[in-house]
Protein backbone atom coordinates (compact mmCIF):
# COMPACT_ATOMS: atom_id res chain seq x y z
CA UNK A 1 0.00 0.00 0.00
CA UNK A 2 2.68 2.52 0.91
CA UNK A 3 4.45 4.14 -0.79
CA UNK A 4 2.35 4.10 -3.97
CA UNK A 5 3.93 2.49 -6.99
CA UNK A 6 3.52 5.26 -9.56
CA UNK A 7 5.04 4.47 -12.91
CA UNK A 8 4.44 6.11 -16.24
CA UNK A 9 2.14 8.64 -14.60
CA UNK A 10 -0.15 5.87 -13.35
CA UNK A 11 -1.15 5.34 -9.74
CA UNK A 12 -1.92 1.90 -8.34
CA UNK A 13 -4.34 3.36 -5.78
CA UNK A 14 -8.06 2.86 -6.23
CA UNK A 15 -10.65 5.54 -5.51
CA UNK A 16 -11.38 4.07 -2.07
CA UNK A 17 -7.68 3.77 -1.25
CA UNK A 18 -7.28 7.45 -2.07
CA UNK A 19 -10.21 8.34 0.17
CA UNK A 20 -8.76 6.37 3.08
CA UNK A 21 -5.46 8.26 3.14
CA UNK A 22 -5.00 10.36 6.28
CA UNK A 23 -3.93 14.02 5.93
CA UNK A 24 -0.26 13.28 6.55
CA UNK A 25 -0.22 10.51 3.93
CA UNK A 26 -2.03 12.83 1.54
CA UNK A 27 0.91 15.16 1.80
CA UNK A 28 3.43 12.48 0.89
CA UNK A 29 1.28 11.03 -1.86
CA UNK A 30 2.45 11.75 -5.41
CA UNK A 31 0.25 14.80 -5.91
CA UNK A 32 0.32 15.13 -9.64
CA UNK A 33 -2.34 14.85 -12.38
CA UNK A 34 -2.25 11.16 -13.27
CA UNK A 35 -4.64 8.29 -13.83
CA UNK A 36 -5.38 5.59 -11.30
CA UNK A 37 -5.66 1.88 -12.12
CA UNK A 38 -9.38 2.46 -12.60
CA UNK A 39 -8.64 5.17 -15.18
CA UNK A 40 -10.03 7.84 -12.89
CA UNK A 41 -8.29 11.20 -12.88
CA UNK A 42 -6.34 11.42 -9.62
CA UNK A 43 -6.00 14.90 -8.16
CA UNK A 44 -5.34 13.83 -4.62
CA UNK A 45 -5.97 16.66 -2.16
CA UNK A 46 -2.89 18.02 -0.45
CA UNK A 47 -3.54 18.58 3.25
CA UNK A 48 -1.56 20.59 5.77
CA UNK A 49 0.01 18.38 8.45
CA UNK A 50 -0.38 20.00 11.85
CA UNK A 51 3.38 20.00 12.40
CA UNK A 52 4.08 22.25 9.40
CA UNK A 53 3.84 26.06 9.29
CA UNK A 54 1.46 27.76 6.90
CA UNK A 55 3.68 29.80 4.59
CA UNK A 56 2.55 29.70 0.98
CA UNK A 57 -0.31 28.44 -1.10
CA UNK A 58 0.12 25.52 -3.47
CA UNK A 59 -1.32 27.45 -6.39
CA UNK A 60 0.81 30.54 -5.63
CA UNK A 61 4.03 28.64 -6.36
CA UNK A 62 5.49 27.27 -9.55
CA UNK A 63 3.93 23.86 -10.28
CA UNK A 64 6.43 21.26 -9.00
CA UNK A 65 7.62 18.33 -11.04
CA UNK A 66 6.44 14.77 -10.51
CA UNK A 67 9.76 13.89 -8.88
CA UNK A 68 9.62 16.92 -6.57
CA UNK A 69 6.16 15.97 -5.38
CA UNK A 70 7.35 12.45 -4.69
CA UNK A 71 9.96 13.63 -2.20
CA UNK A 72 9.31 13.38 1.53
CA UNK A 73 11.25 16.44 2.71
CA UNK A 74 8.03 18.15 3.92
CA UNK A 75 8.93 21.20 1.87
CA UNK A 76 6.55 24.05 2.84
CA UNK A 77 6.17 25.20 -0.77
CA UNK A 78 3.75 22.35 -1.54
CA UNK A 79 0.64 23.56 0.19
CA UNK A 80 -2.96 22.70 -0.39
CA UNK A 81 -5.24 25.11 -2.15
CA UNK A 82 -7.55 26.99 0.18
CA UNK A 83 -10.61 25.39 -1.41
CA UNK A 84 -9.26 21.88 -0.67
CA UNK A 85 -7.78 22.38 2.77
CA UNK A 86 -9.44 20.62 5.69
CA UNK A 87 -7.77 22.83 8.31
CA UNK A 88 -9.62 25.84 9.66
CA UNK A 89 -6.42 27.92 9.73
CA UNK A 90 -6.19 27.76 5.92
CA UNK A 91 -9.80 28.74 5.26
CA UNK A 92 -10.91 32.25 4.46
CA UNK A 93 -13.55 33.95 6.56
CA UNK A 94 -15.69 36.84 5.43
CA UNK A 95 -15.19 40.01 7.45
CA UNK A 96 -18.39 40.99 9.33
CA UNK A 97 -20.27 43.79 7.60
CA UNK A 98 -20.06 46.22 10.53
CA UNK A 99 -16.28 45.75 10.81
CA UNK A 100 -15.96 46.23 7.07
CA UNK A 101 -17.84 49.54 7.30
CA UNK A 102 -15.61 50.75 10.14
CA UNK A 103 -12.51 49.75 8.20
CA UNK A 104 -13.81 51.58 5.12
CA UNK A 105 -14.51 54.75 7.10
CA UNK A 106 -11.11 54.67 8.80
CA UNK A 107 -9.45 54.14 5.41
CA UNK A 108 -11.23 57.22 4.07
CA UNK A 109 -10.12 59.24 7.09
CA UNK A 110 -6.51 58.13 6.62
CA UNK A 111 -6.67 59.02 2.93
CA UNK A 112 -8.08 62.43 3.87
CA UNK A 113 -5.28 62.95 6.41
CA UNK A 114 -2.58 62.09 3.88
CA UNK A 115 -3.98 64.06 0.91
CA UNK A 116 -6.37 66.80 2.01
CA UNK A 117 -5.83 67.59 5.69
CA UNK A 118 -3.67 70.64 4.92
CA UNK A 119 -6.53 72.38 3.06
CA UNK A 120 -9.39 71.20 5.28
CA UNK A 121 -10.85 73.76 7.72
CA UNK A 122 -12.01 70.99 10.07
CA UNK A 123 -8.44 69.68 10.31
CA UNK A 124 -6.98 73.04 11.40
CA UNK A 125 -6.71 74.78 14.75
CA UNK A 126 -7.81 78.42 14.94
CA UNK A 127 -5.84 80.49 17.46
CA UNK A 128 -7.03 83.49 19.44
CA UNK A 129 -5.49 85.95 16.97
CA UNK A 130 -7.44 84.38 14.11
CA UNK A 131 -4.46 82.53 12.64
CA UNK A 132 -5.04 78.95 11.50
CA UNK A 133 -2.56 76.13 11.80
CA UNK A 134 -2.92 72.66 10.27
CA UNK A 135 -3.02 69.84 12.79
CA UNK A 136 0.14 67.71 12.31
CA UNK A 137 -0.48 64.43 10.49
CA UNK A 138 0.94 62.40 13.36
CA UNK A 139 -1.57 63.96 15.75
CA UNK A 140 -4.47 63.28 13.37
CA UNK A 141 -3.35 59.66 12.99
CA UNK A 142 -3.12 59.37 16.78
CA UNK A 143 -6.69 60.63 17.07
CA UNK A 144 -7.97 58.01 14.63
CA UNK A 145 -5.95 55.16 16.16
CA UNK A 146 -7.02 56.15 19.68
CA UNK A 147 -10.62 55.93 18.54
CA UNK A 148 -9.99 52.45 17.11
CA UNK A 149 -8.35 51.34 20.36
CA UNK A 150 -11.29 52.66 22.37
CA UNK A 151 -13.70 50.70 20.19
CA UNK A 152 -11.67 47.52 20.66
CA UNK A 153 -11.61 47.94 24.44
CA UNK A 154 -15.35 48.45 24.62
CA UNK A 155 -15.97 45.29 22.62
CA UNK A 156 -17.89 44.70 19.45
CA UNK A 157 -21.60 45.39 19.11
CA UNK A 158 -24.13 43.76 16.84
CA UNK A 159 -25.70 47.12 16.08
CA UNK A 160 -23.78 48.60 13.14
CA UNK A 161 -25.42 52.02 13.45
CA UNK A 162 -24.56 52.25 17.12
CA UNK A 163 -20.93 51.34 16.45
CA UNK A 164 -20.53 53.92 13.70
CA UNK A 165 -22.30 56.60 15.75
CA UNK A 166 -20.08 55.90 18.75
CA UNK A 167 -16.98 56.02 16.60
CA UNK A 168 -17.97 59.37 15.08
CA UNK A 169 -18.76 60.80 18.50
CA UNK A 170 -15.44 59.62 19.91
CA UNK A 171 -13.66 61.18 16.95
CA UNK A 172 -15.45 64.47 17.61
CA UNK A 173 -14.58 64.37 21.31
CA UNK A 174 -10.94 63.50 20.59
CA UNK A 175 -10.65 66.26 17.99
CA UNK A 176 -12.31 68.78 20.35
CA UNK A 177 -9.91 67.84 23.14
CA UNK A 178 -6.99 68.27 20.79
CA UNK A 179 -8.23 71.70 19.69
CA UNK A 180 -8.68 72.76 23.32
CA UNK A 181 -5.19 71.50 24.10
CA UNK A 182 -3.72 73.43 21.18
CA UNK A 183 -5.63 76.60 22.15
CA UNK A 184 -4.38 76.30 25.74
CA UNK A 185 -0.84 75.82 24.47
CA UNK A 186 -1.18 78.84 22.17
CA UNK A 187 -2.63 80.96 25.00
CA UNK A 188 0.25 79.96 27.25
CA UNK A 189 2.71 81.12 24.60
CA UNK A 190 0.85 84.43 24.27
CA UNK A 191 0.96 84.91 28.05
CA UNK A 192 4.69 84.22 28.07
CA UNK A 193 5.19 86.69 25.23
CA UNK A 194 3.23 89.39 27.06
CA UNK A 195 5.23 88.79 30.25
CA UNK A 196 8.51 89.06 28.35
CA UNK A 197 7.38 92.28 26.68
CA UNK A 198 6.50 93.79 30.08
CA UNK A 199 9.86 92.71 31.48
CA UNK A 200 11.64 94.19 28.46
CA UNK A 201 9.81 97.50 28.97
CA UNK A 202 10.80 97.60 32.65
CA UNK A 203 14.43 96.89 31.78
CA UNK A 204 14.41 99.70 29.23
CA UNK A 205 13.06 102.16 31.84
CA UNK A 206 15.63 100.97 34.36
CA UNK A 207 18.41 101.37 31.80
CA UNK A 208 17.20 104.92 31.06
CA UNK A 209 17.33 105.85 34.75
CA UNK A 210 20.83 104.41 35.11
CA UNK A 211 22.07 106.30 32.05
CA UNK A 212 20.62 109.52 33.50
CA UNK A 213 22.36 108.93 36.85
CA UNK A 214 25.67 108.21 35.09
CA UNK A 215 25.36 111.46 33.11
CA UNK A 216 24.62 113.48 36.25
CA UNK A 217 27.57 111.94 38.11
CA UNK A 218 29.87 112.68 35.16
CA UNK A 219 28.80 116.33 35.11
CA UNK A 220 29.32 116.67 38.88
CA UNK A 221 32.78 115.13 38.61
CA UNK A 222 33.77 117.46 35.76
CA UNK A 223 32.49 120.46 37.73
CA UNK A 224 34.70 119.55 40.69
CA UNK A 225 37.74 119.25 38.43
CA UNK A 226 37.02 122.67 36.93
CA UNK A 227 36.97 124.35 40.38
CA UNK A 228 40.39 122.96 41.21
Curated annotation (Swiss-Prot):
It comes from the Eukaryota. Induction: By exposure to the Gram-negative bacterium P.aeruginosa strain PA14. GO terms for cellular component: nucleus. Belongs to the bZIP family. Residues 166-202 are annotated as: Basic motif. Disruption phenotype: RNAi-mediated knockdown targeted to the intestine, but not to neurons, hypodermis, muscle or germline, reduced the resistance to infection by the Gram-positive bacterium P.aeruginosa strain PA14. Reduces expression of pmk-1 pathway dependent genes, such as systemic stress signaling mediator sysm-1 and infection response gene irg-4. This is Transcription factor zip-11. The keyword DNA-binding applies. Residues 166-224 form the bZIP domain. It is found in: Nucleus. It comes from Caenorhabditis elegans. InterPro entries: bZIP, bZIP_sf. GO terms for molecular function: DNA-binding transcription factor activity, RNA polymerase II-specific; DNA-binding transcription factor binding; RNA polymerase II cis-regulatory region sequence-specific DNA binding. Interacts with CCAAT/enhancer-binding protein cebp-2. GO terms for biological process: defense response to Gram-negative bacterium; regulation of transcription by RNA polymerase II. Residues 203-210 are annotated as: Leucine-zipper. Keywords: DNA-binding, Nucleus, Transcription, Transcription regulation. Transcription factor. Involved in modulating innate immune response pathways, acting to promote resistance against infection by Gram-negative bacterium P.aeruginosa strain PA14. May act as part of a feedback regulatory loop with the pmk-1/p38 MAPK pathway. May also function in concert with CCAAT/enhancer-binding protein cebp-2 to mediate immune responses, independently of the pmk-1/p38 MAPK pathway.
Amino acid sequence: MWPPNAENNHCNYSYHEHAELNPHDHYHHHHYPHSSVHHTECYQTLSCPSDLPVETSYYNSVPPSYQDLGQTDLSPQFWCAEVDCVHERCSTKEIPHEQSKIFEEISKECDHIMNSAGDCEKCQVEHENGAQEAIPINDLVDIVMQTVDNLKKEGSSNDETKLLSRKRQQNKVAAARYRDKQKAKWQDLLDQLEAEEDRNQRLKLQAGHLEKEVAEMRQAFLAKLAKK
